[in-house]
Structure formats: C-alpha cells, structure tokens
A protein has these predicted regions:
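N-terminal type II signal-anchor transmembrane helix
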Residues: 6-46
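Short, solvent-exposed mixed-charge patches
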Residues: 220-222
Length: 222
C-alpha cells in the first residue's frame, strides 16, 4: 500500500514537471517570436522626405546622435534642439568640442545660444520622455523629431508617445557602426544588445498595461 502511494506521488510529480516544462517551452517560443517581430520593427533607414518639425530631441548615448541633431537644426528641419540626459557637469561647449570638426555642421553662435537646450534630469528612456514633454510644454511645440539609435527607437517611441499623447513624434534613427542589423544573429555582441533591448521594451510595454497612469513616475536625477 505504501509503495502504491509512493508511485502515485511520483507520477503526480512527473506530471507537474512535464506541465511546467511545457509551459516554459510555450513561453520561450512566444518570447522568440516576439524577439524576431521586435527586430523587424527596428528602422533600416531614414525617411528621405523630411518634413520640418517644431523641435528635435537627441537622446544622449553616441556622437552620431548629436551630429544628426545638429544637422537637422542647421538645415532648418527643426526650430530648436533639445539634448536630453546630459551629465550635470557638461555644457554645450563641451558637447560640441567632443565632436569631430569635419563631422559637425557650422552653427552661428547666436543659433547655439538661442536654439540648443540641454536637459539634465533624465537618467533613462522614461526620464528622457518626461524631460522632453516638460520642455515641449514650455516651448508650446506640437511636433518633434526623435533622434536615437535605431535599435533603441521602438522603446523610445513607446515612452515618448505615452508621455506626449498630443504631440507628433517622428523617428530619426542613427545607425552605430558596431551594431550589425543585417544577419544580427551571427554577431554575438549585436544579438546580446538586441535581446537586452527587447527585454527592456517588454518591461516598458507591460508597465504601461499594468500601470497606465505611471508616465509621471519616471526617475530623474536631482
């Protein structure tokens, strides 16, 4: 009798293990399908038909982003430029001095003084969105071009649309040389980067579903 009970207990345990394994495999399959779908949403190029916007915002994280923002400002595609997430010890002169002169458009001193703003409060993508939303309200702007790395664009757009529902947000991706979007699965560094970005995107997406009113809770630096 005791042996029968042991056998029944072992049988139930194995059933639970199989069910948990099956559940894990289902979730893993869904995650992989989602990853592939996420990668297909990453921009592959810049829209050649650029419409002018009230402003442009650069999310710090690479010189290519800043160069792109300055080019949009210099070409008249944006009235003002916000650089969001700047270190508190950095000023405009320091930022401009960090760029290659040959890659930097020439801007008049008065343009730099009037039309480039630095945001010091954001410490993550949510913070970037909130910082930009505050600045847009102060400037009374209604359209903005978002400049960040292509792989970062889906999550950035999600956060910006959430923080600024009444503002037109247009993507302007840049493409870091070290990120290999084509055949990304063959490049371990790029694969790791995209997996981490996809997981962050899922967290941001789930946060919006569970806490739809949390746009104002993004952490900012004092």
């Amino acid at each position: 009798m005791r042996q029968v009970r042991r056998n029944e207990t072992e049988l139930r345990r194995r059933r639970w293990v199989r069910r948990l394994l099956l559940l894990f495999l289902v979730f893993a399959l869904i995650w992989v399908i989602g990853l592939v779908a996420f990668v297909t949403r990453i921009p592959r190029g810049v829209d050649p038909n650029l419409a002018a916007t009230d402003a442009a915002v650069v999310l710090t994280g690479g010189s290519e982003r800043l160069e792109a923002g300055l080019e949009l400002l210099a070409s008249g595609h944006a009235k003002k430029l916000l650089i969001s997430g700047v270190n508190k010890d950095v000023d405009i002169a320091t930022l401009l001095g960090s760029l290659e002169p040959s890659q930097t458009p020439k801007l008049a001193p008065e343009t730099i003084a009037c039309c480039i703003a630095l945001g010091y409060s954001a410490e993550d993508t949510r913070g970037n969105a909130l910082e930009t939303a505050d600045w847009m309200r102060q400037e009374r702007f209604k359209s903005i071009r978002l400049i960040t790395a292509a792989y970062h664009m889906p999550r950035s757009l999600l956060e910006f649309h959430r923080a600024m529902p009444g503002v037109q947000v247009l993507p302007y991706p840049v493409f870091p040389r070290q990120v290999k979007q084509e055949s990304w699965w063959r490049w371990p560094g790029t694969t790791n980067l995209l997996v981490r970005e996809y997981n962050k995107y899922l967290v941001a997406l789930l946060r919006g579903l569970v806490l739809p009113g949390d746009a104002g809770l993004a952490p900012v630096r004092p």
